[in-house]
Regions:
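Donor-nucleotide binding loops and adjacent catalytic segments primarily
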Residues: 46, 50-54, 178-181, 185, ...
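Glycine-rich phosphate-binding loop signature in dinucleotide/nucleotide-binding domains
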Residues: 32, 92-97, 189-191
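Conserved nucleotide-sugar phosphate-binding/catalytic loop shared by glycosyltransferases and other
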Residues: 4-14, 30, 34-86
Length: 227
């Protein structure tokens, strides 16, 4: 094992977790090109394809989310898979010897940061949403720092651990050279009208879009443009 910076990043399940995780990894590599980064995800989930495509190594755990209702007998299997994942990721952490573990939410980050914290590895949580996820709320007591994008997150996390950093953004989005005029032309907008952008993150985007479609006629009567 080399003496270079080693970081484990864990989480996924949806793009809302995966892309911030990859952005964090890219930022670390930009600052410390020699850094070694290992991702830990959930077997069969989106991260197992997306992370290697971004150029990083990932290992998968047999972890799954709880099934509703919570008293479903199927959750016995979920609990057993979680215990199996804890054993596996404990060995992963011991072998990789990271200086820190970062959790971005999702099934795998619960087991990974649980194991890392028990082994004395400093843990950091990155919460992308204004309403904290179940996994991150569970991990809050174990985390050294909790990075958030919104105010009033003391509702979910210890105030002394919170750092308002904003959400990680992919560099290609920051590097865009598109002008306002080009954007107006691309979307076919009237520059004299007000414009509303409706955007949802990850799997929640479908619900948002369907809600807007049901109210589209009402919105159009307000003489605004919609993207």
């Amino acid at each position: 094992m080399s003496d270079s910076l080693r970081i484990i990043i864990s989480g996924g399940g949806t793009g809302g977790h995966i892309f911030p995780a990859v952005s964090i990894a890219n930022a670390i590599k930009a600052l410390r090109p020699e850094a070694e980064i290992l991702f830990v995800g959930a077997q069969g989930r989106m991260e197992m394809q997306r992370v290697p495509a971004a150029g990083y190594e990932i290992v998968g755990l047999p972890v799954r989310g709880l099934i509703r209702p919570l008293w479903s007998p199927k959750n016995i299997g979920v609990a057993l898979d979680y215990l199996k994942s804890l054993r596996q990721v404990r060995k992963i952490v011991k072998d990789f010897k990271p200086q820190a573990a970062v959790g971005v939410g999702g099934y795998a980050s619960g087991a990974t940061l649980d194991a890392a914290a028990r082994l004395g590895i400093p843990c950091l949580i990155q919460e992308q949403n204004s309403y904290a996820g179940v996994t991150n709320k569970h991990l809050a007591k174990k985390a050294s720092k909790i990075c958030v994008a919104y105010d009033e997150m003391e509702r979910f996390f210890p105030a002394d651990k919170i750092m308002k950093t904003g959400n990680p953004v992919r560099q290609n989005l920051l590097d865009t050279k598109l002008t306002r005029e080009e954007a107006i032309k691309t979307f076919g907008l009237d520059p004299t009208k007000k414009t509303i952008l409706f955007v949802g993150g990850s799997l929640g985007a479908r619900t948002i879009n369907e809600s807007i479609l049901r109210r589209l006629d009402t919105i159009r009567k307000s003489d605004v443009q919609i993207i």
